[in-house]
């Protein structure tokens, strides 16, 4: 593919507020479902994450999904977990991604196998997400695999990691984030956080440590569908920060889908004003069609 398109790396390095979104890879042997979802988001986001067997259930591979995203003219973010592959498979997948022009890679542990629908599957965890970052760093800078074998062509990965927004204690040292930066992470995407004041306190500490100069921080949110889904996220979804005030606001609305979009747009506007926040990551697997209007309402232009 020769079509030029905005790259997440360039957007972030230019100082523009980035909008990324997530598409769950479909349970399908066809590209049609993926292409339809991409069409919904095109023109409304800078990059699209493609999940890697979310919920520990079998889906189209993230690599294939990312290739489809790229073919549709949007910068993909390949998600790669430690759960399903050993170090050989991970290095092979990374080389394949680079060959396909897929440079954004988000490293994750992966959901526990016990949460999935194939309980007898074996979790691999040969290496952890930090090691994947070091692999990409070596492929980028040294042009070598873990064994020291030279690549014929170096990679140009833009590596990322994940984080959970939390209340920073007085003596909080973001050691894990610092390690990710040292291992080569260039951006961080967080789990859902609908609490602006908490984001301010969390990011203020990040800025104080200088980490916001080493990595770009993209805060996870999404347009809610209902107060029921907001309650479920608060109680069941790992890493989610959902204030009661958001749930009450959803409960009091006669049009909860619109209210959810309004809340998300307002959060984007608020995040733009926080020093050290470089973007918003929109996750709405069952409400994907609400993302374009939400982004438009926030005043962000792609």
Annotate each predicted stretch with a short phrase:
Residues 18-32, 76-88, 157-172, 250-262:
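Active-site mouth loops of central-metabolism enzymes
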Residues 19-23, 46-50, 76-80, 105-107, ...:
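Hydrophobic faces of well-ordered beta-strands that scaffold small-molecule active sites
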Residues 28-41, 61-62, 88-94, 169-179, ...:
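Short, acidic/polar
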Residues 23-26, 51-55, 81-83, 110-111, ...:
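Active-site beta-loop-alpha junctions enriched in small/polar residues
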Residues 2, 6-9, 30-32, 56-68, ...:
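Active-site-adjacent beta->alpha loops and helix N-cap segments on the catalytic face
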Residues 1-24, 28, 36, 144-155:
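N-terminal amphipathic alpha-helix/helix-capping segment at the start of soluble metabolic enzymes
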Residues 123-152, 162-167, 209-267, 286, ...:
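Active-site pocket-lining/capping segments in soluble small-molecule metabolic enzymes
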